[in-house]
Amino acid sequence: MSRVAKAPVVIPAGVEVKLNGQVISIKGKNGELTRTVHNAVEVKQEANALTFAPREGFANAWAQAGTTRALLNAMVVGVTEGFTKKLQLVGVGYRAAVKGNVVNLALGFSHPVDHQLPAGITAECPSQTEIVLKGADKQVIGQVAADLRAYRRPEPYKGKGVRYADEVVRTKEAKKK
């Protein structure tokens, strides 16, 4: 049985929550996020908190309730504080630049790589080898970071490539003759 679902999600001041059946909208200073909740979960709004309860007749209702609580908590944090993800480019000649909502990457290919950012996500480059992604939706931030990393994943011998700032790349030893 999930213990996560038993804790309510506290709604801070300045955040507006709308319940419309199974569709929940959360609006704050960083924008508005909407999510459809699984049928096995019943969400109730009480004063300044959201509570979660499983519905009868579903085998995985407690698990779904815990997942829903975690997702809605991430939405509340996203519209109040926002999320950031940092990427590093390691390698000779690997550079990044941001022009509007397009991230331009030079990753050792014969052509530059242009990645279009989705709505609600902003990027900035404090240096040529760093990218900082910011936005309200935790899932979209993670997906964009994974897409950028997928262009040139860190290779295991020298560690060159695009990596998360907190990622530790284990390097192998080169083959000896």
From Swiss-Prot:
<keyword id="KW-0687">Ribonucleoprotein</keyword>
<keyword id="KW-0699">rRNA-binding</keyword>
<comment type="subunit">
    <text>Part of the 50S ribosomal subunit.</text>
</comment>
<dbReference type="GO" id="GO:0002181">
    <property type="term" value="P:cytoplasmic translation"/>
</dbReference>
<dbReference type="InterPro" id="IPR000702">
    <property type="entry name" value="Ribosomal_uL6-like"/>
</dbReference>
<comment type="function">
    <text>This protein binds to the 23S rRNA, and is important in its secondary structure. It is located near the subunit interface in the base of the L7/L12 stalk, and near the tRNA binding site of the peptidyltransferase center.</text>
</comment>
<keyword id="KW-0689">Ribosomal protein</keyword>
<dbReference type="InterPro" id="IPR036789">
    <property type="entry name" value="Ribosomal_uL6-like_a/b-dom_sf"/>
</dbReference>
<dbReference type="InterPro" id="IPR019906">
    <property type="entry name" value="Ribosomal_uL6_bac-type"/>
</dbReference>
<dbReference type="GO" id="GO:0019843">
    <property type="term" value="F:rRNA binding"/>
</dbReference>
<protein>
    <recommendedName>
        <fullName>Large ribosomal subunit protein uL6</fullName>
    </recommendedName>
</protein>
<keyword id="KW-0694">RNA-binding</keyword>
<comment type="similarity">
    <text>Belongs to the universal ribosomal protein uL6 family.</text>
</comment>
<dbReference type="InterPro" id="IPR002358">
    <property type="entry name" value="Ribosomal_uL6_CS"/>
</dbReference>
<dbReference type="InterPro" id="IPR020040">
    <property type="entry name" value="Ribosomal_uL6_a/b-dom"/>
</dbReference>
<dbReference type="GO" id="GO:0022625">
    <property type="term" value="C:cytosolic large ribosomal subunit"/>
</dbReference>
<dbReference type="GO" id="GO:0003735">
    <property type="term" value="F:structural constituent of ribosome"/>
</dbReference>
<dbReference type="Pfam" id="PF00347">
    <property type="entry name" value="Ribosomal_L6"/>
</dbReference>
